Swiss-Prot record:
This is Ribosomal RNA large subunit methyltransferase E. The active site is at K161 (proton acceptor). The gene is rlmE. GO terms for molecular function: rRNA (uridine-2'-O-)-methyltransferase activity. It comes from Cellvibrio japonicus (strain Ueda107). Keywords: Cytoplasm, Methyltransferase, rRNA processing, S-adenosyl-L-methionine, Transferase. GO terms for cellular component: cytoplasm. Belongs to the class I-like SAM-binding methyltransferase superfamily. RNA methyltransferase RlmE family. It catalyses: uridine(2552) in 23S rRNA + S-adenosyl-L-methionine = 2'-O-methyluridine(2552) in 23S rRNA + S-adenosyl-L-homocysteine + H(+). Its main location: cytoplasm.
Amino acid sequence: MARSKSSNRWLEEHFSDQYVKKSHADGYRTRASYKLLELNDKDRLIRPGMLVVDLGAAPGGWSQVAGQQVGTHGRVVASDILPMDTLEGVEFIQGDFTDDSVFNQILLAIGDTPVDLVISDMAPNMSGINAVDQPQAMYLVELALDMAKRVLKPQGNFVAKVFHGEGYDQYLKDLKGCFEKVVIRKPDASRSRSREVYVVGKGFLGCQTVS
């Protein structure tokens, strides 16, 4: 089957991308690893010994970074509907974390250890139709925040990918009602044309309505 011009253009861009080349050289699973590395450098999110929950983890670019950063005395609990190859120091739970059975597996994996950080690089399969894609993207990031509300320890932190568009401003208001500090980041590894940004919530307070 012949490829479309757009798919050929994507392939050319992908394989010439400096972060794709760098990920191969550095042994990271995806270019997305560099987004979390930069976020961590700026916001000091991950430290040795932490417990991190990674939502939408496959193929493992963020879990790989988190596992390296928390070290042998920390843990990463990762979940995705898609399968993910094993990573050292990462416990992977396959399934939809909105299902009670999967959520309970995550809680079982967490155990009695307070969760220091919830991270999410989730995004829907993009159709190119904003009226379809944006609500789906906001739904996922709202699910990630719901999970954070349920498992984060007081003063814990949260990172998630969000797309500019309908629902974005309200989401930021909701975040500001849950954390002492909220910042927006656009890592260098994010493609400039992408509407994606990363919200960083620091110092979990529980949640209250912000007008």
